[in-house]
Amino acid sequence: MDPHAPQRQRSGQRLRALALAALACALSPAHAAIDAQQLGARYDAAQANLAFRVYSSRATRVEVFLYKNPTGSQEVARLALSKDPATQVWSLSLPTSTIKNTYGITGAVYYGYRAWGPNWPYDAAWTKGSATGFVSDVDNAGNRFNPNKLLLDPYAREISQDPNTATCADGTIYATGAAHRNKDSGLCASKGIALAADATSVGSKPTRALKDEVIYEVHVRGLTRNDDSVPAAERGTYKGAARKAAALAALGVTAVEFLPVQETQNDQNDVDPNSTAGDNYWGYMTLNYFAPDRRYAYDKSAGGPTREWKAMVKAFHDAGIKVYIDVVYNHTGEGGPWSGTDGLSVYNLLSFRGLDNPAYYSLSSDYKYPWDNTGVGGNYNTRHPIAQNLIVDSLAYWRDALGVDGFRFDLASVLGNSCQHGCFNFDKNDSGNALNRIVAELPPRPAAGGAGADLIAEPWAIGGNSYQVGGFPAGWAEWNGLYRDALRKKQNKLGVETVTPGTLATRFAGSNDLYGDDGRKPWHSINFVVAHDGFTLNDLYAYNDKQNNQPWPYGPSDGGEDHNLSWNQGGIVAEQRKAARTGLALLMLSAGVPMITGGDEALRTQFGNNNTYNLDSAANWLYWSRSALEADHETYTKRLIAFRKAHPALRPANFYSASDTNGNVMEQLRWFKPDGAQADSAYFNGADNHALAWRIDGSEFGDSASAIYVAYNGWSGAVDFKLPWPGTGKQWYRVTDTATWNEGPNAVALPGSETLIGGENTVYGMQARSLLLLIAK
């Protein structure tokens, strides 16, 4: 398990340790084309008919309930669906004239399903809130049908509201078990909304190669919730986020990666805006994989979130910025067994579980319990063809209809599971797993750019063989946790953790050991120092330990990683800022794709809280006012990004060569010891060596700089570096030095204003724990 894997603690759920023998699982049948079953509620082209289609192989009866209003009123129609035994799809088509004239629905059509099955057979005498027909909460086949629970359509394009809101605060109505199974959830349950086709433009998608991206990870609500430049009513919304496209483009960001925006349980955050009770800010508990989260919309009318999302995407596209979204297909918002129960009977039935539990969830070998590699209730059954259909269909919808350019997959190792029930086994060579199906049906963007999706994995989960940094199949980029750890250890744990120069060199050059053995490239390494789950960049260098038990608004937060590889630089604030500059510079000068977290450009702090999943507050909202020091760091970040974008030698399509490939007597990449000699294997492997430099031949990449030189002093004292040959007739010029004496608005020199340092054999003295960047000209 990755020592920095997300620690997500949720009330009402628990991690159930299952130690069952591995069970061989049959391969899935051949999968269908994208959206082949046309599931969901869909109007025909003339909007004369509305068809409802839902999958369940185990249900014995399915009914659709139609509503005029999202909550607080009874259904206006209850209609049985018919099953196609060949596809296991239940369907019903209604003329829109009937919906209007017979059922009196003149506005949006809200709907939900109720399902019966072997553990609760249909009985015509059943009424809402009754036990008529009940046999058991779960049977030996894993069925958990309960007609008292109105179920959200897994393919709904929008949903009415979350299950729990200010007016529907009783979460027990969704539960099974003796105390709750007869409670009817219809008045409060989330309902699907039938939407007609929408023509809102998403603009022209950028087609840049992944290697050229600079990724900015941010929460769509947190981006503007605290921004006075955005109209008050638009703060924290898609519409508000659209207003920041120009600012992010000016920073140099090329791709914005939003934390989950698929509908999640977060309406409860508004019940008590100054409390963490029941709050879910990050959004990693997905209720529906097609619907943009309604809470983030300024326009909350039916269809409003979809239109507003698309308009926001267009704003980013118009600014040349790709839009990525963080997706959570390893588990769902239904969670697992209720805390404090026997783990068998009491579960939430919101959608998937009540329609076809064994199809949508990986279960224990006796089908009674969830199999959990996620820590939040149980694995989504990513090896089942129907569950895979939903993954691929929803991804295609976000890509094609909603304009998304790429996806970051949370705990993506679960999508490499090669079995369904009673076991977990990551197998990248299993052609039928979800990872390989996604690549086959949603082709990744070509290496040189063009049409396609950028696919990024968080390559770990919990337990088993789920830690897979470097282990994903072709087509997948990965969050490189080993890059993060190497930098943190070297910067913050000198004398405690061993990181050799060879390890650093491998990470700085694109991690050939991880991605070069299977045909992948340096740009399949998504490099990062911090992410949303953990310390901010500022806090990584300002705190020795997490500070999660703070009063509102910066806490309290449970969980959180204890092994952070952080250090407060001896409490010296100037050294903390220097460390942040150095870490950011190493990130921007490494081969691979850099990712920063929203606010790190201005030294945003969470005051040491490293698990702010439950804080819908100023702890997570970006602040846009700047002190002089914050403004300096933002300028520093902006200029570093600009330098990276201006120099293709830093963004190689292939791993660097140690040879001279263009005949100018300079190797494409050469590593140096501080004394100017070439670093050899003995130096690379020396645990007591803490300084390293490298030179890239820019001419081999068509770079405007004939050579680029980077020196990193990871030692606790000053070190002199002897500069190498800059090329015939060239001298070295300083772009930046992260030393404390160079802090300020011009810490990174603008093109043409670099400082002359000298030629070959010039000696340059470097402060402890600092970085030097030179170009030859």
Swiss-Prot record:
EC top class named in words: hydrolase
Q: Which domain of life is it from?
A: Bacteria
The record lists Ca(2+) as bound by: 162, 263-264, 266, 293
The positions annotated as site (Transition state stabilizer) read: 533
Q: Which InterPro entries match?
A: GlgX_Isoamylase_N_E_set (IPR044505), Glyco_hydro_13_cat_dom (IPR006047), Glyco_hydro_13_N (IPR004193), Glyco_hydro_b (IPR013780), Glycoside_hydrolase_SF (IPR017853), Ig-like_fold (IPR013783), Ig_E-set (IPR014756), Isoamylase_C (IPR048644)
Q: Note how many cofactor molecules are bound and how.
A: Binds 1 Ca(2+) ion per subunit.
Signal peptide start-end: 1-32
Q: Which cofactor does it need?
A: Ca(2+)
Which GO molecular function terms does the record list? isoamylase activity; metal ion binding
pH behavior: Optimum pH is 6-7.
Q: Where is the active site?
A: 410 (nucleophile), 458 (proton donor)
Cysteines engaged in disulfide bonds, as pairs? 419-423
The alphabetized list of GO BP terms reads:
carbohydrate metabolic process
What are its E.C. numbers?
A: 3.2.1.68
Pfam families per UniProt: Alpha-amylase, CBM_48, Isoamylase_C
Reactions performed catalytically: Hydrolysis of (1->6)-alpha-D-glucosidic branch linkages in glycogen, amylopectin and their beta-limit dextrins
Keywords tagged on the record: Calcium, Disulfide bond, Glycosidase, Hydrolase, Metal-binding, Signal
Q: How does it assemble?
A: Monomer.
Q: Which protein family is it in? A: Belongs to the glycosyl hydrolase 13 family.
Q: What does this protein do?
A: Has a high rate of hydrolysis for glycogen. Does not cleave pullulan.
- Protein's UniProt name: Isoamylase
Q: Which organism is it from?
A: Flavobacterium sp
